[in-house]
């Protein structure tokens, strides 16, 4: 469907923060094997990163976000939370500044 096609397009064209965070998630032993995937549709929404085994979604918040985008992100958070997902919002600017620090914070949320 259209959501799946959009997810594929987004996977092919990651933002700088997505690229940096994905590399960090793949290379950091604390997250390896935890089942994280990139740009995955869940219902009508596309998640930036999700781990189905952990029921954890990482949502990147862009530096400049329109009111519409913020509203959509809030709706996505409600939708996912209602379905038992833990949604971690991460500022893209923080990923670009210090991905290691962001991973430490995520690890605290995700657990061992």
Task: Please tell me what each predicted stretch does.
Residues 38, 42-110:
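Basic, amphipathic alpha-helical patches used to engage nucleic acids or provide basic targeting signals
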Residues 1-34, 111-112:
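Solvent-exposed, charged helical/coil patches
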């Amino acid at each position: 469907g259209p959501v799946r096609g959009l997810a594929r397009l987004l996977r092919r064209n990651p933002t700088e923060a997505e690229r940096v965070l994905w590399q960090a998630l793949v290379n950091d032993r604390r997250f390896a094997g935890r089942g994280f995937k990139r740009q995955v549709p869940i219902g009508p929404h596309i998640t930036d990163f999700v781990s189905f085994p952990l029921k954890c979604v990482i949502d990147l918040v862009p530096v400049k976000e329109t009111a519409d985008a913020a509203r959509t992100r809030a709706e996505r958070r409600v939708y996912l939370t209602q379905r038992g997902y833990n949604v971690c919002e991460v500022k893209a600017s923080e990923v670009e500044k210090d991905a290691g620090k962001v991973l430490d914070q995520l690890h605290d949320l995700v657990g061992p």
